[in-house]
A protein has these predicted regions:
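Glycine-rich, low-complexity intrinsically disordered segments
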Residues: 1-188
Length: 188
């Protein structure tokens, strides 16, 4: 079937196009006292960009006489989840992400002038109860697609560049989160 402009515009007029700037993020921290630095609702509001992560099916070559094909095997792999946050004046967002990482591997301890002991926390402490939910909203604000990421933790927190040349524009910090899996929790 050849491309038809009238059919295309009819579909757009009927169903509309999705806008990437209509979304909500909800983060449930592990129960480790992080909300004393910044309440979950405030961090959620400061989220500037989010990704709806993808999934890759692992495959391996299957070679039979004459025909070669890739066949699926094993569990899927999931792309990391990246969120970018606006920073408030006192950098509470950066401090919270740093504190969460410090729970995972203690590298700075205010009670010990020599730094942390680099002990790694138990997985259940920093990730087991953590959930990030990203909801894609319609133009009217109705949820149309909802992903829930389970057992999340910040693997990477970006550096923040300071510059005398930049006089406007808000400061931002990005974090890349690892998670065990995601699932579609959209209500039909």
């Amino acid at each position: 079937m050849a491309f038809n402009v009238e059919n295309f515009t009819a579909i757009i007029a009927d169903k509309g196009l999705s806008s990437s700037n209509k979304f909500e993020v909800a983060i449930a921290f592990p129960s480790t006292g992080l909300t004393s630095i910044l309440p979950e609702t405030e961090l959620n509001l400061m989220c500037d960009t989010a990704t709806i992560a993808g999934k890759t099916i692992q495959s391996t070559p299957e070679i039979h006489y004459g025909v070669r094909r890739e066949v699926a095997y094993n569990a899927p792999t999931f792309d990391p989840l990246t969120l970018t946050f606006y920073c408030t004046e006192k950098l509470a967002e950066k401090k919270l992400l740093d504190a969460w990482q410090n729970i995972i591997v203690q590298h700075s301890n205010p009670e010990n002038g020599n730094g942390g002991n680099f002990n790694v926390a138990y997985y259940d402490t920093y990730a087991k109860s953590s959930i990030i939910t990203i909801t894609k909203l319609s133009v009217s604000g109705e949820p149309v697609y909802k992903h829930e990421y389970r057992e999340v933790y910040p693997k990477t927190v970006s550096a923040i560049e300071l510059s005398h040349a930049t006089s406007s524009g808000p400061m931002k910090v990005s974090a890349t989160f690892n998670y065990i899996y995601w699932k579609d929790v959209t209500q039909s």
